[in-house]
Amino acid sequence: MGLTGTMLVLVSLAFFGSAAAHNCQNGTRPASEQDREGCDYYCWNAETKSWDQFFFGNGEKCFYNSGDHGTCQNGECHLTNNSGGPNETDDYTPAPTEKPKQKKKKTKKTKKPKRKSKKDQEKNL
């Protein structure tokens, strides 16, 4: 095995060793990630010199720092408690409201024609 082969083995061991040290694989929650909110976490990839994203398994309990709790499903934390905001289980039917009370309309009395005064009656005769 030449120098290239040896380097490949060492790099592979370093990569797998760093991933194994953090137990980085989809579907698991490493002990180092117990306080991680949501359903994903990142592990350093020494080979690519970047962070790789991993996801907790379906059914894994998840939480947000706001205090909301849920269950992981396809890499997303689906909330199981109601925080007061909308979520996929909320029904968007508005709360019933009372019908405003209508004021009773006063019935208008028909005005009787004014009676002519005695003076006016005498003039017309």
Curated annotation (Swiss-Prot):
Q: Output compositional bias ranges, type Basic residues.
A: 101-118
Induction / repression: Induced in salivary glands by blood feeding.
Query: Which tissues and organs express this gene's product?
Result: Salivary gland (at protein level). Saliva (at protein level).
- Disordered as annotated region, ranges: 75-125
Compartmental location: Secreted
- Record keywords, A-Z: Blood coagulation cascade inhibiting toxin, Glycoprotein, Hemostasis impairing toxin, Secreted, Signal, Toxin
Keyword Glycoprotein in the entry? The reply is: yes
One GO MF term, please? toxin activity
Annotated segments matching region Responsible for anticoagulant activity: 91-125
Q: Where is the composition biased (Polar residues)?
A: 75-86
* Signal peptide range: 1-21
Where is this chain glycosylated?
A: 26, 81, 87
Name any one Pfam family assigned in the record: TSGP1
**CC annotations in GO:** extracellular region
Disulphide bond pairs:
none
**Loss of function: phenotype:** RNAi-mediated knockdown results in impaired feeding of adult ticks, observed as decline in the engorgement weights. Decreased ability of salivary gland extracts from adult ticks to inhibit host clotting in vitro; when silenced together with Salp9Pac. No significant effects on the ability of nymphs to feed. (Microbial infection) RNAi-mediated knockdown has no significant effects on acquisition of Borrelia burgdorferi by nymphs 72 hours after feeding.
Physiological role: Salivary anticoagulant protein that facilitates blood feeding of adult ticks on vertebrate species. Inhibits host coagulation factor Xa (F10). Blocks the assembly and/or early activity of the prothrombinase complex (Xa-Va/F10-F5). Inhibits the lectin pathway of complement system activation in the host.
Please state which protein family the record places this protein in: Belongs to the salp14 family.
Under what name is this protein listed?
A: Anticoagulant salivary protein 14
Query: Which source organism?
Result: Ixodes scapularis
**Gene that encodes the chain:** Salp14
